[in-house]
Amino acid sequence: MNNLKQGKFITFEGGEGIGKSTQSQMLYEYLQSQNTPVILTREVGGTIVAEKMREILVHEELLPMSELLQAIAARYDHMARKIIPALQEGHIVICDRFIDSTACYQGLELENGIDLVYNLHKTLMPSLMPDITFFIDVEPDTAIKRVNSRNMSNKFDIRGIDFYKKIYDCFKELSNRFPERIKTIKASDLSPLEVHELIKKHL
């Protein structure tokens, strides 16, 4: 853990419809029940400014570089105003999406974009990476069925199966690239409670 931090930083990653938000909430409630100082947040968003940026990012069609820089700007505000102060106070911070989502959703749209995402992060925010990341591994065919069954949507939800497969393959690649940090939870055939129990074993 970086010397800047006293708490622990946990992130949840994966494509659309895979249960990240559910697992983030379940872990948050579990840690609260253990009287553990914990906060739950999300990206893109987490602060008033970043949530306004989120509305543009998830609903408007931006140029690829504009979209990446919007995500990075929102993250900088989120980290400075919320994540870093909470970690310095000794809290566990649970974040629904972080840098790996930026790599897959925005980085893939640019030449050498994945490396660019991590290099930008190291330049602008060198002091903070997650201590542990849970990649919720749900097959794209299953994920898109889940998304199609719900009423709410954004521009990423309504893209086709080829997009879902591309994002899935990207997260698989990142889990191989950062095996010490990213823990893969195979969840296609598991209930939310079963997934939650697997996650707890890594804490």
From Swiss-Prot:
Keyword Nucleotidyltransferase: no
Record-linked InterPro entries: P-loop_NTPase, Thymidylate_kin-like_dom, Thymidylate_kin_CS, Thymidylate_kinase
Top-level class of the enzyme under EC nomenclature: transferase
Record keywords, A-Z: ATP-binding, Kinase, Nucleotide biosynthesis, Nucleotide-binding, Transferase
Domain of life: Bacteria
Gene3D superfamilies: P-loop containing nucleotide triphosphate hydrolases (3.40.50.300)
GO cellular component: cytosol
EC number: 2.7.4.9
Alphabetized NCBIfam families for the sequence: DTMP_kinase (TIGR00041)
Stored HAMAP family: Thymidylate_kinase
Role of this protein: Phosphorylation of dTMP to form dTDP in both de novo and salvage pathways of dTTP synthesis.
PANTHER family noted in UniProt: THYMIDYLATE KINASE, UMP-CMP KINASE 2, MITOCHONDRIAL
Protein name per its UniProtKB record: Thymidylate kinase
Species name: Rickettsia massiliae (strain Mtu5)
Gene this protein is translated from: tmk
